[in-house]
Amino acid sequence: MSVITSNPWLMVLAIFIINVAYVTCLTMRTILTLKGYRYVAAIVSFLEVLVYVVGLGMVMSSLDQIQNVFAYAFGFSIGIIVGMKIEEKLALGYTVVNVTSSEYELDLPRQLRDLGYGVTHNTAYGRDGKRLILQILTPRRFEFKLIDTIKQIDEKAFIVAYEPRQIHGGFWAKGVRSKKLKQYDTDEVESI
């Protein structure tokens, strides 16, 4: 530790790296808590506090060095970005995708079901007449693939995606058919 404290550049680098690690843990813990992964969040919070105490101690022992304060602040902002990127890659949870289409002849519900998605659909009436409304629940890691697939089939579709708070029963109670969802390529999907 004395090697780090004796070299101002190593001190700045150490504070930056420690704060990136701390805030990454903080961001992940917050996201895990919001998504209901309480035990994983508790483990991450343990690591978070360990890293925080070390980093804060280093900064507090050398507050007279402005570069250390800047390294701490810069590490904080980068840590948020890193934490969010990790969460994007993990893609925890599910997404509900609502689709409104005027193209009945495309048989969008059947095409999506053939690809492994659970689809609930009904008819609604908008300003310009009859519309097909679809509601599709998918694991978040397949959200963009599903949206790309819908755009391939019906480029005029109106699409809204959001995260549900709770899921009970239905298609997903029987088990997610992730294997089938992974197997197709969106470039190979064609409309009828």
Swiss-Prot record:
The reply on keyword Oxidoreductase is no
From which domain of life does this come?
Bacteria
- Regions that span the bilayer: 8-28, 40-60, 66-86
Query: What keywords are assigned to this protein?
Result: Cell membrane, Membrane, Transmembrane, Transmembrane helix
In Pfam terms, one family for this protein is DUF5698
Q: How does it sit in the membrane?
A: Multi-pass membrane protein
- UniProt keyword Transmembrane helix present: yes
Quote a single Gene Ontology cellular component term.
Answer: plasma membrane
Where does it live in the cell? Cell membrane
Q: Which family is this protein grouped under?
A: Belongs to the UPF0316 family.
Sorted alphabetically, which HAMAP family does this protein's record hold? UPF0316 (MF_01515)
Question: NCBIfam families from the entry?
Answer: PRK04164.1-1, PRK04164.1-5
PANTHER family referenced in this protein's UniProt entry, alphabetically: UPF0316 PROTEIN YEBE (PTHR40060:SF1)
Its recorded name reads: UPF0316 protein SSP0880
Species this chain originates from: Staphylococcus saprophyticus subsp. saprophyticus (strain ATCC 15305 / DSM 20229 / NCIMB 8711 / NCTC 7292 / S-41)
Q: Cite the source lineage.
A: Bacteria, Bacillati, Bacillota, Bacilli, Bacillales
